[in-house]
Regions:
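N-acyltransferase acceptor-side catalytic subdomain
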Residues: 1-207
Length: 207
């Protein structure tokens, strides 16, 4: 994995303009590719923002470590004036912060400080296509910004891990093969249980 772009900045940054995203996109893309998830890349984010909901506003929280290195991105948008959600969650499969899996909890806890600081700019956060037992959701619940689960609606969806070649770009054959294997596992899983692995979560501030 190439070196992630660094910036001498504060630990957390809130992006509310599409133009402000550009300096962070290299680091953001590297983090998303390391997780193998195209739905949390800046490319997916911009495409959805430009073509699916032109009224949505960026609400992207950038997390940096003590050296100023970007180590996490929470790629949210604000819709309807006050609701936060992942960009394209209504048409994508799985969503989570773009960060190393082992950093999800800490990165999200730091993002809570931003949510609390800007509490007057949003009223509800709706997270579709997320794993209900993931570390990052735990971070939202206990990260210093009091959030509570309002509803949980189960919807099972397949998840395809994007394979990349040596230069970091996804390969068509690997994606197709990954999808085929994912579908096979999904069929086996559906026969064994009726429980969903993914849930739609609606989270709201409780202050």
């Amino acid at each position: 994995m190439p070196n992630i772009e660094t910036r001498a900045a504060t630990a957390m940054t809130l992006i509310t303009s599409a133009d402000e995203l550009t300096p962070w996109e290299v680091a953001w893309r590297q983090l998303a590719e390391a997780r193998g998830n195209p739905f949390v890349t800046p490319d997916w984010y911009r495409s959805w923002l430009e073509h699916y909901d032109e009224d949505a506003e960026p609400f992207v929280i950038i997390s940096c470590d003590s050296t100023g290195t970007c180590d996490g991105v929470l790629p949210l948008v604000r819709t309807g004036g006050s609701a936060l959600r992942f960009a394209g969650a209504d048409i994508g499969d799985q969503f989570h912060p773009a960060c190393h899996e082992s950093h999800e909890l800490e990165s999200t806890r730091r993002a809570c400080a931003v949510l609390r600081e800007h509490a007057d700019e949003w009223s509800t956060a709706v997270f579709h296509g997320t794993e209900i037992d993931s570390d990052w959701l735990s971070g939202l619940r206990d990260g210093g910004s009091p959030l509570r689960v309002v509803t949980g609606l189960a919807t099972a969806m397949p998840y395809v891990r994007t394979c990349v070649n040596s230069n970091g770009t996804p390969t068509g054959q690997s994606v197709a093969g990954s999808f085929e294997r994912t579908c096979a596992r999904a069929r086996i899983s559906c026969r064994r249980t009726t429980m969903s692995h993914f849930d739609d979560l609606k989270i709201a501030p409780s202050w």
